[in-house]
Structures are given as C-alpha cells and as structure tokens.
C-alpha cells in the first residue's frame, strides 16, 4: 500500500481511498466508518508547528452543513501594516458541536462588509470582525495566488497559503486577534520548510 500511496503523491494526488472487500462495503456520502478509509498526504506530512489564526469570514455550506458554514476564512496578523491577511479556508476538523459553538461565538461579530483591517482577495459569503482565534494545522505552506499572507514578499503576485488545513479542536480564547501567528512567523516557517525539503 505504501508504494501505491507514494506513487499517488508523485502523480499529484492527495492520497488514496482504501476500500474493504466485504460485501457490505458501499460508499455512503458523509458517513464515517472503517469500510472506506482515506489515506492522505497530510496524514504523513505536517507543519512543524500549528498556526493560531483569526476567523475573518465564512463560506456557505452544502448538504448537511447548509445550516452552518462550509469553511472559514482564516488570517494571520501583520503588525507592520496592522492588517489581517488570509492564509487558508478551513472546513475540516470540526465536530457537530463545533459548528453550533462557532455559530454562537461568531453571530455577534458578523458584519456587512469586509473589515477595514482585513486584506483579502477572496470574497467571503459572510464577514466577521477579527475576534476569534483558532488553532489550525495542515500539511505545508505553499505559494498561493489567492491568499494575501506574504503577498509579493517571496514571489510576485503570490502569497502563502496552508495546504490541507484542519481545525485542531483548540479555541484560543487566551489570545486577542493581534496575538495570532504573524505574517513574519509564517514566512519563517515557509523558509524553514523549504530548507528541510532540500
């Protein structure tokens, strides 16, 4: 299986889906079990550290998530410009309880337009004032044409984005939005990640 997995990654895939050979092993969308298992690249590689990012927006969900958000737009903080710059859209790692809790926590902070301190190319369906910090993990930091963290600082017309972001389950109530992971810290993480790969 490991050789199939490595070949899939080399071919640009996210990973493998492994299926049981039992007769009752049928795919059921949105259902979790052990008859079909995802074996993804980010399960094998991950950031050296987690990121504490600020919720600045949300995108509508579909299907079972229609009553909540599908993903949250997350940002780092840049103290030099006093701006929150996008790093990822995160939609995995959330439990049913998290959806309800986040809906309650963010409701009072919803605003009509993008906050003036938010630097985003993406247009969220819902905007929030920078308020809530969440701990996020992922596979790696990559150059991004849509995220504004480190925009033009590493490559022209590119920022840095987090691949395969996932909520760790940790709410950082101990941090203000300005205490979130900084743009400078993310640039350093990206540069260290490149050194490790080489």
Predicted stretch roles:
Residues 116-122:
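Short catalytic/ligand-gating loop segments at beta-alpha or beta-beta junctions
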Residues 179-198:
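Acidic, low-complexity intrinsically disordered tails
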Residues 1-112, 123-126, 133-184:
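Nucleic-acid 5′ end/cap handling module spanning
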């Amino acid at each position: 299986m490991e050789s199939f997995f490595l070949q899939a990654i080399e071919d640009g895939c996210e990973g493998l889906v492994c299926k049981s050979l039992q007769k009752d092993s049928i795919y059921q969308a949105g259902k979790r079990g052990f008859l079909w298992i995802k074996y993804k690249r980010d399960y094998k590689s991950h950031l050296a550290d987690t990121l504490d990012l600020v919720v600045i927006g949300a995108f509508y969900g579909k299907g079972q998530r229609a009553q909540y958000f599908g993903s949250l737009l997350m940002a780092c903080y840049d103290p030099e410009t006093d701006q929150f710059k996008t790093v990822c859209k995160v939609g995995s790692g959330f439990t049913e309880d998290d959806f309800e809790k986040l809906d309650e926590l963010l409701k009072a902070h919803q605003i009509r337009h993008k906050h003036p301190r938010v630097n985003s190319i993406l247009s969220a369906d819902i905007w929030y004032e920078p308020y809530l910090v969440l701990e996020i993990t992922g596979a790696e930091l990559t150059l991004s044409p849509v995220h504004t963290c480190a925009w033009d600082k590493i490559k022209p017309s590119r920022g840095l984005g987090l691949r395969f972001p996932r909520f760790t389950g940790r709410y950082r109530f101990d941090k203000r939005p300005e205490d979130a992971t900084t743009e400078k810290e993310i640039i350093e993480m990206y540069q260290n990640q490149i050194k490790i790969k080489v």
